[in-house]
Amino acid sequence: MYRFLSGIKVVEIAGLAPVPHCGMMLADFGADVTVIDKKNPAIEQRLNRGKTMKQLDLKNPEDIKKVRDLCQTSDVLLDPYRPGTLEKMGLDPSTLWNNNKGLIICKISGYGQTGRMSQETGHDINYVALSGMLPTFSGVNATRPWPPANMLADFAGGGLSAAFGILSAIYARSHNGGKGCLLDCSMTEGVAYLSSFVQHYYDQPNLFTDKYALFSGECPIYRTYKTKDDKFVAVGAVEPKFYQNLFKLLNVDGRDLFVNPGKITEDLESRFLQKTRDKWANIFKGQECCVTPVLDIHEVGSYGQHVDRNSFTKTSSNWIANPSPRVWTQDELAALSSKK
């Protein structure tokens, strides 16, 4: 992995989910990340790839001074706490900027640093719920909204958004006289921003709100199907050329797709139950139908495409994703092209 962020120093106050994920991404691309954690933390931190660990007690004034000293020579401070917590410790922006005007202070919280809910507790499901997106993510026909694991707010709306903000602030610092800033990352707002496409097109009922809308979870050409071995394939045949290929290969009469989608769904369900997931994967290979196997976390790294690109690393229990995006230098790309 190319160390584009080499020379950037980050102080990460240990926390849950979004902050360690953000710190890991920065470390993956070369930043020098120091994690401040207490001895014997209640929760084991596993997103510490490439980081340096430092045990300090943030209730101890001497250790607070050590954090302040670290910030004096660092570029970024990652704050996982409820708004106002670091300020009570004497690690407020004014004090930190007096010692280091270039420090970028990134505060990741559920609802933001201001507003009537800034001090409220919550977790991923709460932030997604308040973003307005939970019903859409659950599907139009769901009997109740269900949370899609804890990835959307914590890691996309939180960690990933914060990393983008930090890199933007580092760039801005090179043009504003070296001044840092405070990044107020609300995970609720991060999910909402992530959902901009949905917001802009929500007035199109055939996309989101009709019973068989394209992204409702029930549309016959955009959903999952069970296979003979009780596994699943994913169908994403949105464009006409793709769903026409799908119907032809499966010998399904798709002329009533938009008139009687329920019947098309039944026909496709029946077809996919006739073979195993992996047999279907081989059948659809190269057929331009947008059909892929649904992989679980224990098998994902051994899938052919992922092996070709070394996308995952095997641990004792799971496959762990390698950093993304992949970087190709001009020389590497030229060498790759010459081999084709």
Swiss-Prot record:
It is an enzyme of class 2 (transferase). It comes from the Eukaryota. Keywords: Transferase. GO terms for cellular component: mitochondrion. GO terms for biological process: bile acid metabolic process. One of its GO terms (molecular function) is transferase activity. It holds the Pfam family CoA_transf_3. Its EC number is 2.-.-.-. InterPro entries: CoA-transferase_III, CoA-Trfase_fam_III, CoA-Trfase_III_dom3_sf, CoA-Trfase_III_dom_1_sf. The active site is at D154 (nucleophile). The keyword Transferase applies. The keyword Transferase applies. PANTHER family: ALPHA-METHYLACYL-COA RACEMASE, SUCCINYL-COA--D-CITRAMALATE COA-TRANSFERASE. Belongs to the CoA-transferase III family. This is CaiB/baiF CoA-transferase family protein ZK892.4.
